[in-house]
Amino acid sequence: MEDFVRQCFNPMIVELAEKAMKEYGEDLKIETNKFAAICTHLEVCFMYSDFHFINEQGESIIVEPEDPNALLKHRFEIIEGRDRTMAWTVVNSICNTTGAEKPKFLPDLYDYKENRFIEIGVTRREVHIYYLEKANKIKSEKTHIHIFSFTGEEMATKADYTLDEESRARIKTRLFTIRQEMASRGLWDSFRQSERGEETIEERFEITGTMRRLADQSLPPNFSCLENFRAYVDGFEPNGYIEGKLSQMSKEVNARIEPFLKTTPRPIRLPDGPPCSQRSKFLLMDALKLSIEDPSHEGEGIPLYDAIKCMRTFFGWKEPYVVKPHEKGINPNYLLSWKQVLAELQDIENEEKIPRTKNMKKTSQLKWALGENMAPEKVDFDDCKDISDLKQYDSDEPELRSLSSWIQNEFNKACELTDSIWIELDEIGEDVAPIEHIASMRRNYFTAEVSHCRATEYIMKGVYINTALLNASCAAMDDFQLIPMISKCRTKEGRRKTNLYGFIIKGRSHLRNDTDVVNFVSMEFSLTDPRLEPHKWEKYCVLEIGDMLLRSAIGQVSRPMFLYVRTNGTSKIKMKWGMEMRRCLLQSLQQIESMIEAESSVKEKDMTKEFFENRSETWPIGESPKGVEEGSIGKVCRTLLAKSVFNSLYASPQLEGFSAESRKLLLIVQALRDNLEPGTFDLGGLYEAIEECLINDPWVLLNASWFNSFLTHALR
């Protein structure tokens, strides 16, 4: 039957049916007839709605699929096939906008022409029997019932069949075809006999007669009657039961379930060692932009043209020198690399026509910085398998690092508002259905809260850099291409702005596999003096390259301008994910949406407007040593976005492991707070699994510190 369903029905219908069965905890491998029934019901609901629209005069019209009038209002709103929360949101929205009475049970459709909810039934039995069952269950004259059978019969409330003859005939023909197809495969009889009546759930209903006798006979051993078994189930305490099952599994297994109390958990141990260092692919809060407003120069939009135009806005260049050397690098090479960039940009400006791309001369300093000819030679295994002492080269264990305050400062800065607008969402046409209206409203409110956020700047910067680097890696594999680090935004007044953060020079990039690495040197402008937090800049060589005049309360002040230079690397798969950083917006929007849904289901109406416009209400943002931090809904949006962005910027195996393992401990603590009396075994092993992920990654260490704050306040 399962194979038949997958062949016979549209994949979208099959997927919706799978979700519905999963939501109700039913196994489609076992309940195959139910699977077929759900697919049939979904298809009938969709066919009922298909091609029916309402024109500007409010009349119901039929439009064939090839007709271009796509913006006509659908006559029917489809409720069936949505998950329960979303379905109730749609129903509540319809009731609020049309004044319709709210139904007790979820209906299948809403008819905008007749202004009524519709319950669709598809039966393998007599239509009038099924109709009565539906009517008894719904107990509402406001919901219209329409029943179809596989034999071509139909029945509807007050013989009002809603649709025209032809539309109903299409549904009946399809049902008849499904029946024929099932019969030809020998599936029909089983399907026909498996239909149960409409189920109504009653509290502790009495079982009598034959059913009672069968219930008593089918109990597990040691139970004489149903009442005894019910009493046992109601008073069942799981402690001890799981140990028994485990001991049967293997002589090696010896698990004692320990009660998890408020005093049980200890804080996660963070590693000791030197402070952790910055490891993002580009500077975050310390970045400095050279910008042009309302760009209209020749070649505007071509990165190299934009970069040269931005460079011309700064007049404070001076002879560069190293102010913070890289401990292990050849620092003069970094200095020479920057001088080479300046010289080659000057050469371009002297040319008659500026080229679209710039490949750097392969000088000794760039060859060193980009690791040219540094990779160990690869030898075929067959040529060396006879060597007696052949072994994998030793690699050192990573050095443990401690949490440093700079990463919390980075996160705080990412949550802040800037004075620029970083995203503009495309127009997606007019809303037709209520659910689209709600979705657009939520999207617009959310965008307003995060469009000025610094985390959004990081998204656009990340998307640009990764796209440019991947393009160059594929288009100029052997060249040391100069790639400007650019972003675009709008000022508060709506003027366009192009920003230059610095440059990347790409090394050789013959990337065959997803994980093959391309080396690059990044050179980024900053006003941050690296000597204030030298541990943060361990991987960088920092040059002083100029003096910048800044406006301040006391007039103009001169500040030294620095260039942060380092060798770095990335891979095709990392660049691919970097290009998709806009997904962070979607993830945080979905988290906000689940908060709105929870609020809406309590109030039984869509709470989007109140949620965003009630400025007096505060929401929990996170834990800190002081306690639960709270803030406005805008602050919540920006914090969730910043977390998502940092998960992308600082993605690592350490983060994957910590997230997966700490989640288990979080669920146990949550169960304790919900008074579910959780029990655990091998809690020490869980702590070990969490703590082995705490090595040197700044973002993971910060998350572990936040987790400890949560433990402290959650278990008070």
From Swiss-Prot:
Q: Name one GO cellular component term.
A: host cell cytoplasm
Q: What class of enzyme is it?
A: hydrolase
Cofactor comment text: Binds 2 manganese ions per subunit.
The UniProt function text for this chain reads:
Plays an essential role in viral RNA transcription and replication by forming the heterotrimeric polymerase complex together with PB1 and PB2 subunits. The complex transcribes viral mRNAs by using a unique mechanism called cap-snatching. It consists in the hijacking and cleavage of host capped pre-mRNAs. These short capped RNAs are then used as primers for viral mRNAs. The PB2 subunit is responsible for the binding of the 5' cap of cellular pre-mRNAs which are subsequently cleaved after 10-13 nucleotides by the PA subunit that carries the endonuclease activity.
Q: What is its EC number?
A: 3.1.-.-
What InterPro entries does the record tag this protein with?
A: INFV_PA, PA/PA-X, PA/PA-X_sf
Gene that specifies this protein: PA
Species this protein is from: Influenza A virus (strain A/Chile/1/1983 H1N1)
Does the UniProt entry include the keyword Lyase? no
Q: Where does Mn(2+) 1 bind?
A: H41, D108, E119, I120
Q: Which residues bind Mn(2+) 2?
A: E80, D108
Q: Name one GO molecular function term.
A: endonuclease activity
Per the Swiss-Prot or TrEMBL record, what residue ranges does the short sequence motif Nuclear localization signal 1 (NLS1) cover?
124-139
Q: Write the protein's name.
A: Polymerase acidic protein
The answer to whether keyword Hydrolase applies is yes
